[in-house]
Amino acid sequence: MIRFTLIALLALAGCTGKPDNIKPVTDFRPNEYLGTWYEIARIDHRFEKGLSQVTAEYSLRADGGIKVVNRGFDSKSGQWKQSIGKARFVEGKDKGYLKVSFFGPFYGAYIVFELDEPGYQYALVSGPDTSYFWLLSRTPIMDPALRERLLDTAVANGFKRED
């Protein structure tokens, strides 16, 4: 678990910028974004390599930030891995632009650039550049046609498809 957290930290350390063509959603409603999200697709990175059944749980912190609990199953070890972090808003709570830290003062960008309205049932998320991408859903299984449409949107925005 410590290795999972440290690799995530190192991969995102100091990377709070955003890709030029990616714009955070506006009129973001943090309280509606809270709760459990299921990872439907991603661009693989060392901190998630080999993990399946990945979830992200977001809850409100007393300081106004967001608690982040990422969890995934490592089939190689046969164990669940979990990493706990915190997120803060970069440009105000009404924009889907946050910075996330899993260790100390090191933050990485978390940019929600497409979000289901009004229900917040899916989200497209970028990191500091287009090598970081996640498709998240409120349910562990997504309608295949919707999944394809969202992945096409990601590709049109410069993300590489890995499935």
Where are these regions (language model features)?
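A beta-rich soluble binding module of mature secreted/lumenal proteins
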Residues: C15-D163
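Sec-dependent signal peptide recognition
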Residues: M1-A8
